[in-house]
Curated annotation (Swiss-Prot):
Record SUPFAM superfamilies: ARM repeat, Clathrin heavy-chain terminal domain
Stretch list, region Trimerization: 1564-1708
Region listing for WD40-like repeat 3, in residue ranges: 114-155
Organism (species): Oryza sativa subsp. japonica
Family, per entry: Belongs to the clathrin heavy chain family.
Protein name in UniProt: Clathrin heavy chain 2
Length: 1708
C-alpha cells in the first residue's frame, strides 16, 4: 500500500544524532520524553551534561553541565527533575529546578534507591523503588508519600513504565523480566494494577498498558478503561492479546463490556513484544508499539483491528503521547524521533473499503469529524428516515462528520414528516438531539426559535443562549425582539449587528453602553446629538457619558470647551465642574484656560468647592495671580497666601490669623525662604506677641533646620520670650547634642519656674556642660536642690554638693541624698563632712541610718586615710551583731583588734569571715607568726611560703607543706629553682614526716618526690621509713615503691630488696622487672611467689632456654607449665616433642594448631595418638573428622569402619568430600555409603569404574545432576543400556532435556538418542519438550516418521520450535500442518502457495484461507488459483466472499480476461451492491441476452453506470432489452427519454407509469394529447387515473370535450368532484373553529384589561418624552410586508392528504 494512502501517517520529526548527541547516549537510561514538548538526554562524556530539546525549536537544544543519574522534563513547563545517587550509599538525592526562573523548587533525599521515575501528571512525580511506589508533589513542602508496595510478580523486573488515570484513582506499574528457559528470547511482561480507593493490587501479565476515558451510551459520566497488551507462552504456545476492561463500574449505569483481540505477529517477529501503548482520545484508537518497530492500531470501543505495519527498522525503546495531533512520538536506537498520527483523509476510506468494516468507518468519522464516510452516512440516514426511525436518524445527523447532514434540507425533511397524535414531532426530536450534542448553527437556531416563540416558551431560549447552544444572527434577534427586547439585545450583540445594538441601547437609555460597545466594534455614532439628548433628562448621565467620551481612544470626539459650554448654558455648574475635574486630571499645559475657568466659576459661586480643588493640588497651569485675588476676596486667605509671590502681599494676608488654620499657616511657612519666614515671624510677634507666639513657636519647631536654631533662639531672645524659648527648645532638645542648647533649655525652664522639667533634664540629659550647669544652679539657689543633686551625683561633684548643702544648712537634702539617691557615695559624703569638721554624732547617725546599704570598704578607706577608723567601731559591731558576713566588715574589725592587741590569735583562728590574705598582709610587718596563722587558715600558699622564706621559718613551712598534701604546692617548693629546697627537704625528712602519723601525708610526700624526679632522695626517705623500724615498715605500697624505685634508679639493690622484703606485689613487680630486662630478678620474684607459669614464661620468652624450661617443668610437674613448654616446642617446629608435651599436660585446647602442624610435618601416626587423647577431653567434629582423615592417610580403612560405627560427632559429609577431593576414593566410598549420600557415592563409583553400582546409587539419589553425571559417563564408556536408564530419568526434566540431546548428538549417537526419546514418550512424566525434541530428531534423521508423529502428538508439541526445524529441513507439508495447528494461517497459506507441489490440498487451503489476517494474501490466493486451479476458483471465492474487496477481484479477473469464470461468485456477492460487480454481471447478461436476470439486477442493485447501460441497451435488437433501457432512464429521472423510448415501442402502460412517477404535470398533459392524437381513447382514460395527481381538471375536461371523449373522462371527473367537496367541507369547519377561538381570546383580553384598570389611579402620570425619543419602537417589519402568519410552516397536526395513485372507483 502506498504511504500516501496509508491510514497512519509517519514522519521523522528530528534525529538526535544530528543535534550532536553521540549514539551511545541514545538508550533507555539516557533519553527521556515525558510529553510531546521536550526530549531530555543525559550525556556522560566528554563531560557530564543534560541536553534539553524543545520540540517547538528542535534545532536549538539547551545543553547544561549537570551531573545526574537521570533527568526528566516536566510534561508542560520548563521544570527539570534530577536524580543522583549519593556516593557510598544506596540512597538517591532528588531535586526539582525551574529552568526559566533558575531556582530550586524543592529537593529530597530518598532512603532507598529509585529504580524508575516518571511524571504521571504535570504536578506529580511517580517514584519506584525496589519495594514500593511513592508520589511526590512539586507543590508545597511535602515529602514523597508512599502509595503501595510492589507485588511479588514484579520482583527482579526492570520497570519500564508507570501511569495513572486522569482521576488519580487507578495506578499501573509495568515491568519486564527475562523469558522462560524454553524461550528466553521472548521477554516476560508483568503488570501491577492498584486501586487508590480500595487500597488493593492485582498482578497481571502484560508488557504495556494505558488508561482511557470512554462515554458509554446511556451514561453521562465517562467510564475509566484500562487497556493492556500481553504476549505469553503456555505449554509452548504463544498467545498475544489486547484487553480493554472497565475499572470501577458505576452502579445502576450502563457499563463498558470487556473486549479483547489478538495481536498477530509476523513469523519473523515471534520473539518481538509490546514495549509501549498510547491511546488517542481524539480518535478513540489504541496504538501498540513493539520493540522491533511494529505498530498495531485498534479501535478503543470495539477492540477491532484497524492497521498493522512496521514503522521503524531499528528497535524502539521510548514513546510519548502527542495529544495535539492524536498520535504519538517514538524514539529508536538510531536516534530517530518518529511522529505517527492518523491520516485524516484516508483512514475512513481504508476502514470501509480495505477492512470492509462499515460500522467502524462511520463511528470513526463521527467520533473525530473525519471525511470519507459521506456516502455511508447519507445512505444510512435515508434508510433510517425511510424506516421512520426518526430518533436514530436525528442522532446520526447530529453526529454526522463535518456537519454533513446539518443542512436546511435536513430540517425541511423533518418538517415535512406528518406528526402523529400524542407523539413528539420528529423536528423537535431532531433539535433536541442537536442540543444534547452541542451547539446549533444559524439556520437551525432560527428554525428552533420560531417553534419556541410560537409556543411562548421564552425561558427555553434564555437557557439555550446561556448555555451557548444557539448561534446568534440578526434574523434571530429580529424574531426574538417581538417577545423580549433584552434577550434580543443579547442576540444582536453576539451576532455583531451593530446598528440594531445601538438602537436598542438608545431605546433603553443606556448611553454609556453605546460608547463601550461602539469602541469594541469600531462604530461611530453622533456623539453631540446623544449628549444633548441626555442633558435634557439626566444631567448626571450626561456627565458620565461625556467622561466616557473623553476616555475614548484617539481622543474625545467633542471638544472639552464645547461640552463645558453645554453644561453652563443650562446653569449646570456642579455637572460642568465634575466633568472638568475628571478630564483635567492629566494636568496638561494646553488645559490652562479650562483650569482657570473651573476655578473662577467655583470661587464666585461655590468657594468651598474651589478650596477643595486647590487643596487637592491637581492643577498647576491656571492663572495664579487671578486666582489669588479671587481667593482673597472670597476669604480664602490661606489659598491667597499660597498663590501670592510678593512679600508685601504675603504680610498683608498673613496677619489675618483669626481666619487661617494655625497648622495650615505653619505648613505655609515651609514654602517661604529663610529670610522671608523670619520677617513674617517677626511681624506676627510685633502685631500680637501673646496671641501669635504659639504659631511662631510651632513654625520654628517645624522648620528649625531650614531657619537655623541659632536664628530662632535670637528671635525669641530679642523679644525676651523665655516662654517661647522654653517651648521651642523643648521640641528640639531630644534630637540635639549641643551642650549650649541643653544649658539654655535648663536656664529657660528655671526662669519660667518649670522646676520639674529642670530636674528631669538634669537627670536624663547627657549633653549639657556639667560644670556650667552646677555653677548656674548654685547661683540660682533654687528652693528645690534636686536638680543640683542630679548634676553633682552624675558628674562626680559629690564633695562640692556636700559642701554646698552643709554650708547652706540643707542637712535634710544630705540625709535624703545618702539614704535615697545614692547610698554608694556615702563614703565621699562622710569624708567631706569630716573635712568640714562636722560633728561626729551627725556623721555616726548618718552612717547608722544607712547601715547595710553603705559600702564598707570605701568607707573604711576614707576613715583610714584620715586616721579615724575607730569612728566605725560601733557601726561595725552593730553590723556583726545583725549577722553580717561581709568580708570587709570583718577585715576592718580584725584590723582594729590587731591594732588594739586584744587577743588577736583567737580572732584569727576562730573568725571564719575575714579575708586571710588582706589581714595576713596587715600582720606581716607587725608579727610574722600572726601572718602565718592567717595564711594557714586561708591556705594562702604563695604568701605563707614567701613569709616563711623571708623569716627562715622552714620548720613551719615543712609542717604546712606536709599537712597540705597538695601536689601543686609540692611541685612549687621542690622545683630546682627554689633556693630553699634543700632546707625544706631536710626539715621534711628529719621532722615533718617522722612526726606524721597519717599515711596520706606520707603518700603525698612520696608522690611529690617521685614527681619531682628525686629518686635518690626518695630512696633515702623510704629506707628511713621502711627499713628502720617505723610505723610504716610493713607497708605494702612503700615496699613496692622502694623496689620499683630501685629498679629505676639503682638496679644493683633490687636483688637485695627482693630477698629482704616479703610484703610487696610479686606479680606486678615481676612484670616491671621483666620490662626493665632484669630477667633473673623477675624469675626469682615469680619463683619466690610460686608463680610457676610466669616463671617458665620468663625462661621461654626472655631467657629463651627451652632446656631450662623443660628442667623446670620436670621439677614442678604442673600441667600449665607443660602446656607452655609444648606451645614453645610447637612454635619451634618440634612437632613430635610438642605432641608428647601436650599429652603430658593433658591439654586439648590447641588441637587446631597441632593438627595443622602435624599435617604440614606429615606425622599422622603421632597425630592419631594426640587426637585419641583429645577425644577423651572434647567432642569436636573437627577432631573426629581429622582422626578419620589421618586413618585414611595411613591406610587404616578397617579403623575407619570401626570408628564410624562408634559414637562420634564428625561431619561425615565434609570428611567424605575431602577424601573425594584428595582422591582417596575407597575411604570416601565407605563414608558415602555409611551416610547414604547416594549422589556422591554414584560419582565416586564412576571414578572407580563401577558403573552398575553407580547406576544403583543414582537411582537411590534420584537427582538430575547425579543422573546426568552417571549418564554422560556411561555414554563415554559406551554403556548405552545403563545410559538409557539414566537418560529416562533426566529427560522428564524440561531444563535438562536439551543438554542430554546435545551430548548424544555431539558424540554421533543419533539412533541411541532417538531410542531414548521414543522410550521417554511412554513415561508418566513425559512433557512437551520430549515430544518436540523427538519431532526435531525425526525432522533431521528420520523424516519418514515426522508426519505421523506430529499428527499423533500435535497438542503436545512446541510448535514454533518444530516449525523452525521443518523450515530448515524443507519438510513443506509437515510445515503447513504445523502452521495450521499453531493458528499461523498467513504463514500456512504462504507456504502452500510457495510449495504447492508438496503442500497444496484444496480443502485444507480453503480452511486456511478464511482464517488469514493479511488481506494481501487473499488476492495472492486468487492469482494462485487462477494460474494453477482455475476450476476451483469459485469455490475459493465463495469462501472468502466476506473478506474480499469485490472490486479488486473483478479487476483481477477482467485483466486476466476470465470474468465469465467467476460469474457464480459475482452473483453470490451482488447483494453488496458493488459497482464493479454490478457492471460486470450486467455486461455478461447483455452478452448472454438474459433480460430477465438483467432486469432483476438493474431493479435490485443501482450502483452502476446507469446512463451508459441505458444508452447501450436502447439500440439493442431485443424489445425487452429496450424496455430495460426505458426503465433505467425512468429510475435516473430522465423522464422524457424514457417516455420517448416507450412510445417508440408502443409500451403505453410504461409511458403512463413513468409520467405518474415523474410528478411533472406538463409531461402528463402532453401524454394525454399524444393519446388523443393517436386515437387511443382507452389509454386516455387510463392515463387520467394513473396521473390523477398531476392532471388539472380543467385541462382534462377541455381535452375530453374538444375531442369527444367526455365519456372516457367522466369517471375521473366524478372522483375529482367528490374529493373537492370533501376538502371544502373540512375548510369550512376549520374556519368556524378558528373564529370561535378568536372570540374566546378577545374576551379573555378584555377581562384582563378590566382587571388591570382597577389599579390605574395608583400609577404616576406619564412624563412627556423628549422629541425623537418617545413612543413605542417602530415595527421591525418593512412597509408593505404581509403578516408572517404561521412563519411559512404548514400546520404541525395531521391534515387531509390527496390520494396517491388511482382514486377509489365509485359506483357509476
Amino acid at each position: 500500500m502506498a504511504a500516501a494512502n496509508a491510514p497512519i501517517a509517519m514522519r521523522e520529526a528530528l534525529t538526535l544524532t544530528s543535534l550532536g548527541i553521540a549514539p551511545q547516549f541514545v538508550t533507555f537510561t539516557h533519553v527521556t520524553m515525558e510529553s510531546e514538548k521536550y526530549i531530555c538526554v543525559r550525556e556522560t562524556s566528554p563531560q557530564n551534561s543534560v541536553v534539553i530539546v524543545d520540540m517547538a525549536m528542535p534545532a536549538q537544544p539547551l545543553r547544561r553541565p549537570i551531573t545526574a543519574d537521570s533527568a526528566l522534563m516536566n510534561p508542560n513547563t520548563r521544570i527539570l527533575a534530577l536524580k543522583a545517587q549519593i556516593p557510598g550509599t544506596t540512597q538517591d538525592h532528588l531535586q526539582i529546578f525551574n529552568i526559566e526562573a533558575k531556582t530550586k523548587i524543592k529537593s529530597h533525599q530518598m532512603p532507598e534507591q529509585v529504580v524508575f521515575w516518571k511524571w504521571i501528571t504535570p504536578k506529580l512525580l511517580g517514584l519506584v523503588t525496589q519495594t514500593s511506589v511513592y508520589h511526590w508533589s512539586i507543590e508545597g513542602d511535602s515529602e514523597p508519600a508512599k502509595m503501595f508496595d510492589r507485588t511479588a510478580n514484579l520482583a527482579n523486573n526492570q520497570i519500564i513504565n508507570y501511569r495513572c488515570d486522569p482521576s488519580e484513582k487507578w495506578l499501573v506499574l509495568i515491568g519486564i523480566a527475562p523469558g522462560a528457559p524454553e524461550r528466553p528470547q521472548l521477554v516476560k511482561g508483568n503488570m501491577q494494577l492498584f486501586s487508590v480507593d480500595q487500597q488493593r493490587s492485582q498482578a497481571l501479565e502484560a508488557h504495556a498498558a494505558s488508561f482511557a476515558s470512554f462515554k458509554v451510551v446511556g451514561n453521562e459520566n465517562p467510564s475509566t478503561l484500562i487497556c493492556f497488551a500481553s504476549k505469553t507462552t503456555n505449554a509452548g504456545q504463544i498467545t498475544s492479546k489486547l484487553h480493554v476492561i472497565e475499572l470501577g463500574a458505576q452502579p445502576g449505569k450502563p457499563g463498558f463490556s470487556k473486549k479483547q483481540a489478538d495481536l498477530f505477529f509476523p513469523p519473523d517477529f515471534q520473539d518481538d513484544f509490546p514495549v509501549a501503548m498510547q491511546i488517542s482520545q481524539k480518535y478513540g484508537l489504541i496504538y501498540v508499539i513493539t520493540k522491533l518497530g511494529l505498530l498495531f492500531v485498534y479501535d478503543l470501543e470495539t477492540a477491532a483491528a484497524v492497521y498493522r505495519n512496521r514503522i521503524s527498522p531499528d528497535p524502539i525503546f521510548l514513546t510519548a503521547e502527542s495529544s495535539a495531533s492524536g498520535g504519538f512520538y517514538a524514539i529508536n536506537r538510531r536516534g530517530q524521533v518518529l511522529h505517527a498520527t492518523v491520516n485524516d483523509a484516508t483512514i475512513v476510506p481504508f476502514v470501509s473499503s480495505q477492512l470492509n468494516n462499515l460500522e467502524l468507518a462511520v463511528n470513526l468519522a463521527k467520533r473525530a469529524n473525519l471525511p470519507g464516510a459521506e456516502n455511508l452516512v447519507v445512505q444510512r440516514f435515508q434508510e433510517l428516515f425511510a424506516q421512520t426511525k426518526y430518533k436514530e436518524a436525528a442522532e446520526l445527523a447530529a453526529e454526522s462528520p463535518q456537519g454533513l447532514l446539518r443542512t436546511p434540507d435536513t430540517v425541511a425533511k423533518f418538517q415535512s414528516v406528518p406528526v402523529q397524535a400524542g407523539q413528539t414531532p420528529p423536528l423537535l426530536q431532531y433539535f433536541g438531539t442537536l442540543l444534547t450534542r452541542g451547539k446549533l448553527n444559524a439556520y437551525e437556531s432560527l428554525e428552533l426559535s420560531r417553534l419556541v416563540v410560537n409556543q411562548n416558551k421564552k425561558n427555553l431560549l434564555e437557557n439555550w443562549l446561556a448555555e451557548d447552544k444557539l448561534e446568534c444572527s440578526e434574523e434571530l434577534g429580529d424574531l426574538v425582539k417581538t417577545v423580549d427586547n433584552d434577550l434580543a439585545l443579547k442576540i444582536y450583540i453576539k451576532a455583531r449587528a451593530t446598528p440594531k445594538v445601538v438602537a436598542a441601547f438608545a431605546e433603553r437609555r443606556e448611553f454609556d453602553k453605546i460608547l463601550i460597545y461602539s469602541k469594541q466594534v469600531g462604530y461611530t455614532p453622533d456623539y453631540l446629538f446623544l449628549l444633548q439628548t441626555i442633558l435634557r433628562t439626566d444631567p448626571q448621565g450626561a456627565v458620565n457619558f461625556a467622561l466616557m467620551m473623553s476616555q475614548m481612544e484617539g481622543g474625545c470626539p467633542v471638544d472639552y470647551n464645547t461640552i463645558t459650554d453645554l453644561f453652563l448654558q443650562r446653569n449646570m455648574i456642579r455637572e460642568a465642574t465634575a466633568f472638568l475635574l475628571d478630564v483635567l486630571k492629566p494636568n496638561l499645559p494646553e488645559h490652562a484656560f479650562l483650569q482657570t475657568k473651573v476655578l473662577e466659576i467655583n470661587l464666585v459661586t461655590y468657594p468651598n468647592v474651589a478650596d477643595a480643588i486647590l487643596a487637592n493640588g491637581m492643577f498647576s497651569h491656571y492663572d495664579r495671580p487671578r486666582v489669588a485675588q479671587l481667593c482673597e476676596k472670597a476669604g480664602l486667605y490661606l489659598r491667597a497666601l499660597q498663590h501670592y509671590t510678593e512679600l508685601p502681599d504675603i504680610k498683608r494676608v498673613m496677619v489675618n490669623t483669626h481666619a487661617i488654620e494655625p497648622q495650615a499657616l505653619v505648613e505655609f511657612f515651609g514654602t517661604l525662604s529663610r529670610e522671608w519666614a523670619l520677617e513674617c515671624m517677626k511681624d506676627l510677634l510685633l502685631v500680637n506677641l501673646r496671641g501669635n507666639l504659639q504659631i511662631v513657636v510651632q513654625a520654628a519647631k517645624e522648620y528649625s533646620e531650614q531657619l537655623g536654631v541659632d536664628a530662632c533662639i535670637k528671635l525669641f531672645e530679642q523679644f525676651k520670650s523665655y516662654e517661647g524659648l522654653y517651648f521651642f527648645l523643648g521640641a528640639y532638645l531630644s534630637s540635639s547634642e549641643d551642650p549650649d542648647i541643653h544649658f539654655k533649655y535648663i536656664e529657660a525652664a528655671a526662669r519660667t519656674g518649670q522646676i520639674k522639667e529642670v530636674e528631669r533634664v538634669t537627670r536624663e540629659s547627657n549633653f549639657y556642660d556639667a560644670e556650667k550647669t552646677k555653677n548656674f544652679l548654685m547661683e540660682a539657689k533654687l528652693p528645690d536642690a534636686r536638680p543640683l543633686i542630679n548634676v553633682c551625683d552624675r558628674f562626680g561633684f559629690v564633695p562640692d554638693l556636700t559642701h554646698y548643702l552643709y554650708t547652706n544648712n540643707m542637712l535634710r537634702y544630705i540625709e535624703g541624698y545618702v539614704q535615697k539617691v545614692n547610698p554608694g557615695n556615702a563614703p565621699l559624703v562622710v569624708g567631706q563632712l569630716l573635712d568640714d569638721e562636722c560633728p561626729e554624732d551627725f556623721i555616726k547617725g548618718l552612717i547608722l541610718s544607712v547601715r547595710s546599704l553603705l559600702p564598707v570598704e570605701p568607707l573604711v578607706d576614707e576613715c583610714e586615710k584620715r586616721n579615724r577608723l575607730r569612728l566605725l567601731t560601733q557601726f561595725l559591731e552593730h553590723l556583726v551583731s545583725e549577722g553580717s558576713q561581709d568580708v570587709h566588715v570583718h577585715n576592718a574589725l580584725g584590723k582594729i583588734i590587731i591594732d588594739s592587741n586584744n587577743n588577736p590569735e583567737h580572732f584569727l583562728t576562730t573568725n571564719p569571715f575575714y579575708d586571710s590574705r588582706v589581714v595576713g598582709k596587715y600582720c606581716e610587718k607587725r608579727d610574722p607568726t600572726l601572718a602565718v596563722v592567717a595564711y594557714r587558715r586561708g591556705q594562702c600558699d604563695d604568701e605563707l611560703i614567701n613569709v616563711t622564706n623571708k623569716n627562715s621559718l622552714f620548720k613551719l613551712q615543712a609542717r604546712y607543706v606536709v599537712e597540705r598534701m597538695d601536689g601543686d604546692l609540692w611541685d612549687k617548693v621542690l622545683q630546682p629553682e627554689n633556693e630553699y629546697r634543700r632546707q625544706l627537704i631536710d626539715q621534711v625528712v628529719s621532722t615533718a614526716l617522722p612526726e606524721s602519723k597519717s599515711p596520706e601525708q606520707v603518700s603525698a610526700a612520696v608522690k611529690a618526690f617521685m614527681t619531682a624526679d628525686l629518686p635518690h632522695e626518695l630512696i633515702e626517705l623510704l629506707e628511713k621509713i621502711v627499713l628502720q623500724n617505723s610505723a610504716f615498715s610493713g607497708n605494702f605500697n612503700l615496699q613496692n615503691l622502694l623496689i620499683l624505685t630501685a629498679i629505676k634508679a639503682d638496679p644493683s639493690r633490687v636483688m637485695d630488696y627482693v630477698n629482704r622484703l616479703d610484703n610487696f606485689d610479686g606479680p606486678a613487680v615481676g612484670e616491671v622487672a621483666v620490662e626493665a630486662q632484669l630477667f633473673e630478678e623477675a624469675f626469682a620474684i615469680f619463683k619466690k611467689f610460686n608463680l610457676n607459669v610466669q616463671a617458665v614464661n620468663v625462661l621461654l620468652d626472655n631467657i629463651r632456654s627451652i632446656e631450662r624450661a623443660e628442667e623446670f617443668a620436670f621439677r614442678v610437674e604442673e600441667d600449665a607449665v607443660w602446656s607452655q613448654v609444648a606451645k614453645a616446642q610447637l612454635r619451634e617446629g618440634l612437632v613430635s616433642e610438642a605432641i608428647e608435651s601436650f599429652i603430658r599436660a593433658d591439654d586439648a585446647t590447641h588441637f587446631l594448631d597441632v593438627i595443622r602442624a602435624a599435617e604440614e610435618a606429615n606425622v599422622y601416626d603421632d597425630l592419631v595418638k594426640y587426637l585419641l587423647m583429645v577425644r577423651q577431653k572434647a567432642r569436636e567434629p573437627k577432631v573426629d573428622g581429622e582422626l578419620i582423615f589421618a586413618y585414611a592417610k595411613i591406610d587404616r580403612l578397617s579403623d575407619i569402619e570401626e570408628f564410624i560405627l562408634m559414637p562420634n560427632v564428625a561431619n561425615l559429609q565434609n570428611v567424605g568430600d575431602r577424601l573425594y577431593d584428595e582422591e582417596l576414593y575407597e575411604a570416601a566410598k565407605i563414608i558415602y555409603a555409611f551416610i547414604s549420600n547416594w549422589a556422591k557415592l554414584a560419582v565416586t563409583l564412576v571414578k572407580l569404574k563401577q558403573f552398575q553400582g553407580a547406576v544403583d546409587a543414582a537411582r537411590k539419589a534420584n537427582s538430575a545432576k547425579t543422573w546426568k553425571e552417571v549418564c554422560f559417563a556411561c555414554v563415554d564408556a559406551e554403556e548405552f543400556r545403563l545410559a538409557q536408564i539414566c537418560g529416562l530419568n533426566i529427560i522428564v526434566q524440561v531444563d535438562d532435556l536439551e543438554e542430554v540431546s546435545e551430548y548424544y548428538q555431539n558424540r554421533g549417537c543419533f539412533n541411541e538418542l532417538i531410542s531414548l526419546m521414543e522410550s521417554g514418550l511412554g513415561l508418566e512424566r513425559a512433557h512437551m519438550g520430549i515430544f518436540t525434541e523427538l519431532g526435531v530428531l525425526y525432522a533431521r534423521y528420520r523424516p519418514e516418521k515426522l508426519m505421523e508423529h506430529i499428527k499423533l502428538f500435535s497438542t503436545r508439541l512446541n510448535i514454533p520450535k518444530l516449525i523452525r526445524a521443518c523450515d530448515e529441513q524443507q519438510h513443506w507439508k509437515e510445515l503447513t500442518y504445523l502452521y495450521i495447528q499453531y493458528d499461523e494461517f498467513d504463514n500456512a497459506a504462504t507456504t502452500i502457495m510457495n510449495h504447492s507441489p508438496d503442500a497444496w490440498d484444496h480443502m485444507q487451503f480453503k480452511d486456511v484461507a478464511v482464517k488469514v489476517a493479511n488481506v494481501e494474501l487473499y488476492y495472492k490466493a486468487v492469482h494462485f488459483y487462477l494460474q494453477e486451479h482455475p476450476d476451483l476458483i469459485n469455490d475459493l471465492l465463495n469462501v472468502l466472499a466476506l473478506r474480499l474487496d469485490h472490486t479488486r477481484v473483478v479487476d483481477i479477473m477482467r485483466k486476466a480476461g476470465q470474468l465469465h469464470l467467476v460469474k457464480p461468485y459475482m452473483v453470490a456477492v451482488q447483494s453488496n451492491n458493488v459497482s464493479a460487480v454490478n457492471e460486470s454481471l450486467n455486461e455478461l447478461y447483455v452478452e448472454e441476452e438474459d433480460y430477465e436476470r438483467l432486469r432483476e439486477s438493474v431493479d435490485m442493485h443501482d450502483n452502476f453506470d446507469q446512463i451508459g447501460l441505458a444508452q447501450k441497451l436502447e439500440k439493442h435488437e431485443l424489445l425487452e432489452m429496450r424496455r430495460i433501457a426505458a426503465y433505467i432512464y425512468k429510475k435516473a429521472g430522465r423522464w422524457k427519454q424514457s417516455i420517448a423510448l416507450s412510445k417508440k415501442d408502443n409500451m403505453y402502460k410504461d409511458c403512463m407509469e413513468t409520467c405518474s412517477q415523474s410528478g411533472d404535470r406538463e409531461l402528463s398533459e402532453d401524454l394525454l394529447v399524444y393519446f388523443i392524437e393517436q386515437g387511443k381513447k382507452e389509454c386516455f382514460a387510463s392515463c387520467l387515473f394513473i396521473c390523477y395527481d398531476l392532471i388539472r381538471a380543467d385541462v382534462a375536461l377541455e381535452l375530453a370535450w374538444m375531442n369527444n371523449m367526455v365519456d372516457f373522462a367522466f369517471p375521473y371527473l366524478l372522483q375529482f368532484i367528490r374529493e373537492y367537496t370533501s376538502k371544502v367541507d373540512e375548510l369550512v369547519k376549520d374556519r368556524i373553529e378558528s373564529q370561535n377561538e378568536v372570540r374566546a381570546k378577545e374576551k379573555e383580553e378584555k377581562d384582563l384589561v378590566a382587571q388591570q384598570n382597577m389599579y390605574a389611579q395608583l400609577l404616576p402620570l406619564a412624563l412627556p418624552a423628549p422629541p425623537g425619543m418617545g413612543g413605542p419602537p417602530p415595527p421591525m417589519g418593512m412597509p408593505g410586508m404581509p403578516p408572517m402568519g404561521g412563519m411559512g410552516m404548514p400546520p404541525m397536526g395531521p391534515g387531509p392528504m390527496p390520494a396517491y395513485g388511482m382514486p377509489p372507483m365509485g359506483s357509476y
